[in-house]
Amino acid sequence: MAKKLTRKEKQINELYVETTLDIGKNADNWISFLKRAGYNYKYRFDEQVLIYAQKPDAIACAETKIWNKRLKRWINKGSKGIALITERNGELGLRFVFDLSDTNSNVYGRKFRLWKAEERYTNDIIEALENRFGTMEDKTNLSFAIMSTICNYVVDNIQDYLEELKLVCQNSKLQELSEEQLENIFLNLVTYSTIALTMSRCNLDVDRYLLKNNFDTIEKFNTFETMSILGTATRDFSREMLLEISKTIINIEKEEEKKNNTFEKLNKPIYNEEKTKGSVENGYDLHKEKQLSNTRLNNRKDNESENEIGQIRSNEIGIFETKQEGNIYDANREQPINRSL
């Protein structure tokens, strides 16, 4: 016999369905969601939706035990957790995560810094994307490189999602389309959506390259089932892009940190052994925080119950550490240009 849902579980499930339908009502709502979901790109689509519904400005979420044990950060008194849906053995439940803004740290806390796609990393990112996903049509800058990569990747990998979409088109505005129209609309919208989410997380100006009318067909995805497939495809494709970008940036920063540490050691004054011992005995162990900094969050493969250990991992943290046609906006020309995606 299935477990009866609690009032809170019913409330959160309803919130998930309502918010999923709401973000698909029009282009503005969908774009707004995409620009925030980039910060939670490792979470499943349903989790991204619930984070957006309860705390739209969240940038890094984890359960209390992760903040406490791994990051030595503490939940602020009175903070309200973000409820996410879990499923075990076919039964629904809830777990709660807290955003970085809901936490604080003492002297032993880890200094928290999300990765940033700074301009100095551009060439390395472009090279990594091309090595991972294949030759780009345009790599004039990081924005065009990301767009070219996503266009190729979505075309090559969208078929399974498209087949799922065809099974749930009934009772949606998509059912009035021919099969060819459905394929073109889905391919274009997933491509544009993946570009918007990925570029937003890289702090690139989406509005300079994509127009709002690129997302107008979102209104045809007017059922929970069709929106779920669109959202899942967008999340899956953007996640692959952002994992590669983040890995590249973190590797560069680790190498830079190694060089800095080596330089500091070479230039470090030699202290009297007795003075060093005395400082430790008096509670001024300058190496304590450095020992804590060796803690790293585990990377886990994506699965149905992926938790935030994979969401907030060491990679996110710094310590001292068929063709489709569409309009993409060219900022240099100050007008939309027709590009083959």
For each predicted feature, which ranges?
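N-terminal accessory/interface modules of nucleic-acid-binding and processing proteins
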Residues: 1-300, 304, 318-324, 329, ...
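Short cationic/low-complexity microdomains
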Residues: 308-312
